[in-house]
Amino acid sequence: MEAGPDGKVYFAVAGGEAVDNGLEAALRTELLAHTGTGWVYVYDPADRSVQRVVGGVAGASGLALSPDGRTLYVSDLGNRCVWSMDADARELTAGGKNCQSAFSGLPGYPCALAMEADGTLYISYRWARSGWLEKNADSTLLRGIALRAGQNLQEKLFGLPSDAPCAEAVSTADGSWKRTFTGGSSCTAVCPVGSKVYFGAADSAQVLSARI
């Protein structure tokens, strides 16, 4: 969820799959099934309307607005990228007209996003890039088998090695990569405050932090 300077509230639906077993299960399902049924919506409190901003996202799991509130960034879990679009746009399709890839080929599956006042975008990673998943991207059979497997087996397909990035800081002004954060923890939330950035670690009550 992200609130703009004009009071509008943007929120994401990760995908069309049921979330009866929780958001994490829904995200794993989207990675394996790659349905591309995620949507981002905007709520306008002025007239209490809800409109669709962009669809076709393979796991819409993070949102961030540029400092001026004009550009919306959306993390796409399944495509390992972050889309950017005009915050006032409506009914877009991920990768289609007026929706471009701001950062692609990411080293992991992006989750939460956070924006600083200077235009630095923080991208957290829920899982590291899965070689097995990428190798079998076109195998409906193998993906289907993995989809029906238990949670423990599915987690082993992804994981997060100790040397894998759990988050990165990038410049939205020139696209340069400013810093990589490692720590062996899968991140579900990221929040820069002052001289530190805080990370919510998956399956943990701890809040991690790093100086910036």
Please provide the spans of the model-predicted regions.
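Short loop/turn segments that connect beta-strands within beta-propeller blades
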Residues: 43-48, 86-90, 171-175, 211-212
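A short loop-to-beta-strand structural motif that recurs across blades of beta-propeller domains
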Residues: 38-41, 81-83, 166-168, 206-208
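A short beta-strand motif characteristic of beta-propeller blades
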Residues: 49-54, 98-103, 176-181
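Beta-rich, blade/repeat-based domains predominating
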Residues: 1-9, 17, 34-39, 53-71, ...
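A beta-strand-loop signature enriched in Asp, Gly, Thr, and Trp
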Residues: 85-140
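Blade-level signature of beta-propeller repeat domains, shared across WD40, Kelch, NHL, RCC1
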Residues: 188-212
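Short, conserved, GDST-rich strand-edge loop motifs in beta-rich repeat architectures
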Residues: 11-35, 126-161
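Conserved beta-strand positions in repeat-built beta-propeller and related beta-rich domains
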Residues: 3, 9-21, 56, 72-79, ...
